[in-house]
UniProtKB/Swiss-Prot annotation:
PROSITE patterns: ACT (PS51671). Belongs to the UPF0735 family. This is UPF0735 ACT domain-containing protein CBO3010/CLC_2906. It comes from Clostridium botulinum (strain Hall / ATCC 3502 / NCTC 13319 / Type A). Pfam families: ACT_4. Residues 69-144 form the ACT domain.
Amino acid sequence: MPNKFLIIDNSILPDIFEKVVKVKELLANGKVKDITEGVKTVGISRSTYYKYKDFVFSVSEGVKSQKATIGLLLGHERGTLSKILDRIAEYQGNILTINQDIPINNTANVSITFDISQMSIGLKELVEEIKNTKNVIKVDLIAME
């Protein structure tokens, strides 16, 4: 079953979820040296942190996302990546980074990060269009910020 993401106002959630996010922020900013120190700082158990850390995220810059990263597995065929980039640009997406592995067994992994703040269609619709592009084997939304 595919993951389904919801945006929920933290005021209706138990405090535990916000504390898990706080530990992740403290670790990322270097304000605590490890998970043990982080969970003590915010007042939750290590087991609670580990239970929810991969499932609770904060939304950066309010509700409207600015950047998205997609991961693709592409067949090694001339013009495939170009068609995908054209599709993103067609809907006013702005490419920020492209990382491409060398093709092995006629397939290549590619990740593309792009600005979605001015896009004329939703990200879900764009991903569906990319999935339907010739020689696209797989598309995954990796991150949104």
